């Protein structure tokens, strides 16, 4: 079974690492890593996997690699 989730990312945040639910029900993920060389994407993938209690290998970034809005595919 696969699902997808769209998240809003706040890279370089002093508030992170943190996952919040925004006012419209969207996930907002704060990470300390900068948006350079995929560091923030890796941190978001790890944090999302931990938050959803899934292995990192089951969380794949499918779109939004250079955007603050990212879509992940979740395999259960």
Curated annotation (Swiss-Prot):
GO terms for cellular component: cytoplasm. Transmembrane segments: none annotated. InterPro entries: DUF167, YggU-like_sf. Belongs to the UPF0235 family. NCBIfam families: DUF167 family protein. This is UPF0235 protein MRA_1997. It comes from Mycobacterium tuberculosis (strain ATCC 25177 / H37Ra).
